[in-house]
């Protein structure tokens, strides 16, 4: 089952010729979701071929570089005769402000746009085999991050062991893998735990939006396959990072290390690094044992299962 992240906007508050403002597109099989929607996001979606068929948009906070692309995107969806509803999620208490922006700049789209308030710890999406959970972050506006967390998968079926126990190839294999005991012709009962391994973890992708480093992020991002973290500045601007409620690359790397994340994507890169983000990447590499990288706009990352 595919899980893929496309970085649509990786710049800080100011866009550059190389990087747009904040937006991340996530596709999990047929589910398409957008995390933040900075100015120009719809053009990035056109450039990088994601399409507009998103069903949900998760907004971390209501600063312009995270929301000003939403009215234009909704207007284009409307021009394209969209009928399917769009659910938009914002920090609790901010619904009216976002609705005002939509109504003022996009008019009233002809398709349903549901604006929902979200609180820390809330399960925003509860699907059959994954959920999206909100968590509080530390910025100078009410802000949330979001984590996509897949359910555990069945353990591996040990065909060789099943055959040793006398289980005939066929439907009984499927029954055992589904967690059902089976009875053989001689009356022997084979239990699933005899031939099925321990449950295997699903995947986890965590997006912080703008934030200072927090213990809450460490908890949510534990064993994350991909942590997408604010890394606006390098350490030589640590005071500015603290003053503006952002993180340095080293701070993001420390969070990823403490969470034992597998990969760290450094985003919301200040325009001062527009020509050369290597100080950000190098700083994170020095502090994080996993893979740390500064994605370019348009980069797509496939998320394999942890045991692959």
Curated annotation (Swiss-Prot):
Annotated catalytic residues: 65
Binding site for Zn(2+) 2: 65-66, 210, 268
Cofactor: Zn(2+)
One Pfam short name: Lactamase_B
Record key words, sorted: Endonuclease, Hydrolase, Metal-binding, Nuclease, tRNA processing, Zinc
EC number: 3.1.26.11
Family per similarity comment: Belongs to the RNase Z family.
Descriptive protein name: Ribonuclease Z
UniProt organism field: Natronomonas pharaonis (strain ATCC 35678 / DSM 2160 / CIP 103997 / JCM 8858 / NBRC 14720 / NCIMB 2260 / Gabara)
Lineage of origin: Archaea, Methanobacteriati, Methanobacteriota, Stenosarchaea group, Halobacteria
């Amino acid at each position: 089952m595919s899980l893929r992240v496309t970085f649509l906007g990786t710049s800080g508050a100011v866009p550059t010729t190389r990087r747009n403002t904040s937006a991340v597109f996530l596709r999990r099989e047929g589910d398409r979701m957008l995390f933040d929607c900075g100015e120009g996001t719809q053009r990035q979606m056109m450039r990088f071929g994601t399409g507009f068929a998103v069903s949900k948009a998760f907004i971390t906070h209501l600063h312009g570089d995270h929301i000003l692309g939403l009215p234009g995107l909704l207007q284009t969806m409307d021009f394209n005769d969209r009928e399917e509803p769009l659910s938009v999620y914002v920090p609790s208490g901010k619904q009216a402000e976002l609705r005002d922006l939509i109504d003022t700049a996009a008019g009233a789209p002809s398709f349903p746009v549901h604006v929902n308030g979200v609180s820390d710890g809330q399960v925003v999406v509860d699907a059959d085999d994954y959920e999206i959970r909100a968590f509080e972050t530390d910025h100078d506006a009410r802000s949330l991050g979001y984590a996509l967390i897949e359910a555990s998968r069945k353990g591996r079926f040990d065909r060789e062991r099943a055959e040793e126990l006398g289980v005939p190839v066929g439907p009984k294999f499927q029954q055992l893998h589904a967690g059902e005991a089976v009875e053989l012709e001689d009356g022997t009962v084979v239990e699933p735990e005899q031939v099925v391994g321990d449950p295997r973890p699903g995947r986890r992708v965590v997006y912080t939006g703008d934030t200072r480093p927090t213990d809450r992020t460490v908890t949510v991002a534990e064993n994350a396959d991909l942590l997408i973290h604010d890394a606006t500045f390098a350490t030589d601007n640590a005071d500015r990072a603290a003053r503006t409620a952002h993180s340095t690359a080293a701070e993001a790397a420390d969070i990823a290390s403490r969470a034992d994340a597998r990969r760290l994507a450094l985003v919301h890169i200040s325009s001062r690094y527009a020509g050369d983000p290597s100080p950000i990447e190098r700083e994170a590499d020095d502090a994080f044992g996993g893979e740390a990288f500064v994605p370019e706009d348009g980069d797509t990352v496939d998320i394999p299962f942890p045991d692959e």
